Amino acid sequence: MSLLNDRADRAGHTAIAGSATGGTAEAVQDLDRLILLGIAADLRRRTRLGDGGPHVPGAVAQDLAAAPRHQWIVEHWLAALHEHGMVSRHDAGGYHGLHAPRRAELAAARARMESARAALGYPAELADLMLRSLRELPALLRDEVGVQALLYPDGEPATAEAVYRGNLISRYLNAAAAEVLRDLAERTGRPLRILELGAGIGATTADLLPALDGHPVEFYLFTDLSPFFLDTARRRFEGGFLRYALLDIARDLPHQPGGLDLVVAATMAHNAPHVGRLLDQVAALLAPGGRVVLIETVREHPQSLTSMPFALSTAAGPPERYDARASTTRTYLRREEWLAALEDSGLRVDVDLPRQGDPLTALSQRLFVATADH
């Protein structure tokens, strides 16, 4: 990999210096197990899976009175439980033999959650989110409570900050991304033109903007699908070069071919119906030597099963996917699929972090940086 990869990696590890990473994999497993046990306990209590079987996912969803648009989530959960050995799947697609968590088992998992979230650098808000999402499963499935109410209680972003910024892997990735931007600013001989897609609460923006200090910037266009996030960002960030716009990546991107120095997409490019098509559009927007910075999850961990799927549900059900995820309920592309998609779009991959063997890889979140050579 490139010298830029080394520079970004050093910056990322400097940002988390003093944090122990040796127990990362075990901590991730503890959080995953808590959610899996919680889902299993709920399904045992409220569905026919507590009896013989096999039972098809649709029947289980009916037992749960799941709203039509959320019924796919039940099948998604059952697939995850099967993957982790907590339920058996019949050849015809039905499920049976669901694990029955004991009270002591649930208590032990909850006790381990506190040390696990601390080991991963998550503030207490993450534990609150996980436990509340388990308590609210019936209402979430019935569409009586929206996941946004869990992520932004009372309209405040503290919980979302815990998920997207205030933790070990986010600090590493954001610092590495900021170093990539700093390097670009040093190399570019004119004011920078930057587009951030799906910027959300600005968790990555907040770490990128300081990297621009002392460098000329023509504009930093902060975009999102939601006016709520744009209004929040206007109040939070200062800078005469900051601009704001509503943008839906499921539709065409702004028509500025070859005019951008940097496109940032942090934990959101997977929301595109076809990632390859999105990257083709991004590549067309970049000036020669321009870069795309992606922060992406490359494997769905069970700890997100009680939140992320609800955020993805559309009015018609599961999100439409036309890339490698078509005909599946996969949320994310794998690392190899991201690398291939970037290269297929004519971009040269310069950064792929964390390095293989780094304990941080257990969190399955990565930074990809690719350059337009055209």
How should these model regions be labeled?
Residues M1-R165, N174, A178-L192, P216, ...:
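N-terminal accessory segments
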Residues R193-L195, A199-D252:
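Class I SAM-dependent methyltransferase SAM/SAH-binding core
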Residues A250-V263:
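A short acidic, Gly/Pro-enriched loop at the edge of an enzyme's catalytic core
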Residues L260-G276:
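A short SAM/SAH-binding and catalytic strip from SAM-dependent methyltransferases
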Residues G276-R291:
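A short glycine-rich, Lys/Arg-flanked "PGG" loop and its adjoining helix->strand segment in the class I
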Residues I295-L353:
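C-terminal alpha-helical "lid/dimerization" subdomain adjacent to the S-adenosyl-L-methionine
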Residues A340, R348-V369:
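Conserved Class I S-adenosyl-L-methionine
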